[in-house]
UniProtKB/Swiss-Prot annotation:
The record marks N186 as: Transition state stabilizer. Its EC number is 1.2.1.3. Induction: By abscisic acid (ABA), dehydration, salt stress in plantlets. Induced by heavy metals and H(2)O(2). Thiol-based regulation. Inactivation after dimerization under oxidizing conditions. InterPro entries: Ald_DH/histidinol_DH, Ald_DH_C, Ald_DH_CS_CYS, Ald_DH_N, Aldehyde_DH_dom, Aldehyde_DH_NAD(P). Homodimer and homomultimer. This is Aldehyde dehydrogenase family 3 member I1, chloroplastic. Keywords: Chloroplast, Disulfide bond, NAD, Oxidoreductase, Plastid, Stress response, Transit peptide. Plants overexpressing ALDH3I1 show improved tolerance when exposed to dehydration, salt stress, heavy metals and H(2)O(2). Changing V263I: No effect on substrate specificity, but decreased affinity for NADP(+) and increased affinity for NAD(+).
Length: 550
């Protein structure tokens, strides 16, 4: 079958093999990428696509993806197969769960180099960033699940009430069934495998749909999952919109989606048809409020780490904008400039430690933000672009118009607007004027301001005096609130999001009181009222026909 790939997919795919995606003629789609006198084959196992390339500025082409047909019928058969295997009880045992988790850990250890290469092909992600942000985080989550799985699976004993005496009660976790994980392109390994770890630990059958915009990672995940995991209950489906649509038309026991709000609405609408519960890991405009009493160098370094050293700003928890006072702004900007040069050199566009923009579409989106009326003249640092390499230098802007798209939309790139206020407390109103973000950051030594920030700022998560690190704490839930998402995961929260907590009450055949059965009499009512009010003395009096007032 010839699959028509999205333009973004093709552009990303071309760049992964060293061909400039910036000159693609997007006016014609589908299109053929051709060259006089021959073609080329992407032999890398991570990207199984046959392409023909060109030397010309204007290109047109069809890309043939070497993949099997995947229609609604195939999707239905897949879900039926996985549900049958789930219903057999195969995934519910501790032995199956632990073996699959151990296989994931082994996969990460044995294929770390392949994973790193795929992340570089898709995003030019530096090796150390790939290890810290994706590989080590995923391995850590897997090892925690292996260590704690027996404890997580154990029933939780809870208290019973006097009305059920004698009895005992437990909360028993059970797997939901067959679940769908749809992941994002910006951290394509972490955001694919981490929720799958939770789904497996909870005993589910799972289908992973990786993002087609990160084709090298998508192809690698399909290859590795088929090699390391139980394919009768764990599958990867590659593809774009048609494949995702076919999957969403099926009945799932849960859908876990990481991505943007626009697609999330489509996911929710599809899930509503079958009353399927969803987890939506989205994003938003994550603010960093910077007080004037901070260690300026440390604050600047940590803001950079949570912006440009975090996939070049293409992160849902990355710093989207900074708020500080008018008097302090120039000092903060100078500190950021100094540390940016230390991190990325005088020409950041040539730095190997700065990821590229994922594809031409997102590059153009960011470029248009910079060129918007009233924005370009607000640049105080950076603003350099290189379209052929899909790179934008770390860019700082001061007091861009509130009505600009840069302040109304999630930036998701290396542009950092700084908004100034008279008093640092005025920053709270700026944050509250926007939808609730996935993360919010505060830099201060003022404990009262810190307390107020935690109490008054509604966000998925908060880090004080740093950025993004809260997501590495596995005992903290990671998820959004409001428009930044629904539900949470990481650590035990991943296990719980893919589990149903079933309440179970155990009773014997003894202690069968007549009080609960007809005929209902005034005496029974007196005794039951006393019992339900936990007044044992009154219950005894009522049992013998006396009221507590007699």
């Amino acid at each position: 079958m010839t699959k028509l790939l999205e333009i973004n997919h093709i552009q990303t795919l071309c760049f992964a093999k060293g061909f400039s995606p910036a000159r693609l003629n997007v006016a014609t789609s589908p299109f053929r990428i051709s060259r006089r006198g021959g073609g080329g084959y992407c032999s890398n196992a991570c990207i199984p696509y046959r392409l023909k390339f060109t030397c010309y500025a204007t290109l047109s082409a069809v890309v043939k993806e070497q993949a099997s047909d995947f229609s609604g019928k195939e999707a239905a058969l897949l879900v039926d197969e996985l549900r049958s295997n789930f219903n057999s009880g195969r995934t519910k045992s501790y032995e199956w769960r632990i073996s699959q988790l151990q296989n994931i850990a082994r996969m990460i250890d044995e294929k770390e180099k392949c994973i790193t290469e795929a992340l570089y092909q898709d995003l030019s992600k530096p090796e150390l960033e790939a290890f810290l942000a994706e590989i080590s985080n995923t391995k850590s989550s897997c090892m925690l699940a292996i260590k704690e799985l027996k404890n997580w699976m154990a029933p939780e004993t809870v208290k019973t009430s006097v009305t059920t005496f004698p009895s005992s009660a437990q909360i028993v976790s059970e797997p939901l069934g067959v679940v769908l994980v749809i992941s994002a392109w910006n951290f394509p390994f972490l955001l694919s495998v981490e929720p799958v770890i939770g789904a497996i630990a909870a005993g589910n059958a799972v289908v992973l749909k990786p993002s087609e915009i990160a084709p090298a990672a998508s192809s690698l995940l399909a290859k590795l999952f088929s090699e390391y995991l139980d394919n009768t209950t764990i599958r990867v489906i590659e593809g774009g919109v048609p494949e995702t649509t076919a999957l969403l038309d099926q009945k799932w026991d849960k859908i876990f989606f990481t991505g943007g709000a626009r697609v999330a609405r489509i996911i929710m609408a599809a899930a509503a048809r079958n009353l399927t519960p969803v987890v939506l890991e989205l994003g938003g405009k994550c603010p960093a409020l910077v007080d004037s009493d901070v260690n300026l160098q440390v604050a600047a370094r940590r803001i950079i780490a949570g912006k440009w050293a975090c996939n070049s700003g293409q992160a849902c928890i990355g710093v989207d904008y900074v708020i500080t006072t008018k008097d302090f702004a120039s000092k903060l900007i100078d500190a950021l400039k100094t540390e940016l040069e230390t991190f990325f050199g005088q020409n950041a566009l040539e730095s190997k430690d700065l990821s590229r923009i994922v594809n031409s579409f997102h590059f153009k989106r960011l470029e248009s933000m910079l060129k918007e009326n009233g924005v370009a003249n607000k640049i105080v640092h950076g603003g350099r672009i290189t379209e052929d390499k899909l790179k934008i230098s770390p860019t700082i802007l001061l007091d861009v118009p509130e009505a600009s798209s840069m302040m109304q939309e999630e930036i998701f790139g290396p542009l950092l607007p700084i908004i100034t206020v008279q008093k640092i407390e005025d920053g709270f109103q700026v944050i509250r004027s926007k939808p609730k973000p996935l993360a919010a950051y505060l830099f201060t030594n003022n404990k009262e301001l810190e307390k107020q920030f935690v109490q008054d700022v509604s966000a998925g998560g908060i880090t004080i005096n740093d950025t993004v690190l809260h997501v590495t704490v596995k005992d903290l839930p990671f998820g959004g609130v409001g428009e930044s998402g629904i539900g949470a995961y990481h650590g035990k929260f991943s296990y719980e999001t893919f589990s149903h907590k079933k309440g179970v009450l155990y009773r014997s055949f003894s202690g069968d009181a007549d009080l609960r059965y007809p005929p209902y009499t005034p005496k029974k009512k007196m005794v039951l009222k006393a019992l339900l009010s936990s007044n044992i003395f009154a219950a005894i009096l009522a049992f013998f026909g006396f009221s507590k007032d007699s």
